[in-house]
Amino acid sequence: MLDVALELDDAGRLIYRDVTLSIPRQQGKSTLLLVLWVTRCLLWPDQRVVYTAQSGLDARKKWAGDWLPLLAASPFAGLMTVHRQSGHERVVWANGSRQSLVATTARAGHGDSLDLAVLDEAFAHPDGRIEQALRPAMMTRSQPQFWTVSTAGTPDSSPFLFDKVTRGREIAAAGVTEGVAYFEWAATDDADPGDPATWGSCMPALGITVTAATVQADFESMERHEFERAFLNLWTA
């Protein structure tokens, strides 16, 4: 999907300013986001990239526990300097680009200009205050993107994400090919949740990093609505 989300027009500018990704859990989302922000930092100089998740602590755990070890073992290690001080975590690249973490508050991103903002685990946010805080920081940048990424929640507890998904589906159905990009992997509402064919229809990592045996075991042990939300990316009550 990155080849579409990062598509350029004839002038070499990003076609999409807003990207929403709705996908089941454990389907490669974290790896995709790592590739996204590293690509953005290296493709152009002096980029300002921020990442946040359901909480500042969760964002730091993803950043320090998952992403930094992969980068340290990669060919990119010599191109970056990592700052780990709490509240000032960032990766600074040799070309002047910088990736950092932001708090999950209405003041997130204030005072900075941003090229890419990623709001992960958006189901945990009841409203759009983080987006409202970060969007203005993109106004003066030539190629800004705001990413909203998550597994489904419930309409009552995740109205911000539910609105994003609803509008994204409408935009996709209308055939819009600029401005907003919407990607969703989910089972249909009438699909049999225990059928391996249903799992294969919405779980891109099935058979790669996730086994059918694991999914079967979780299907048998979990509450049905929780399984449908986490594994099939279905909105449940």
What is the predicted role of each segment?
Residues 1-237:
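Phosphate/NTP-binding elements of NTP-utilizing enzymes
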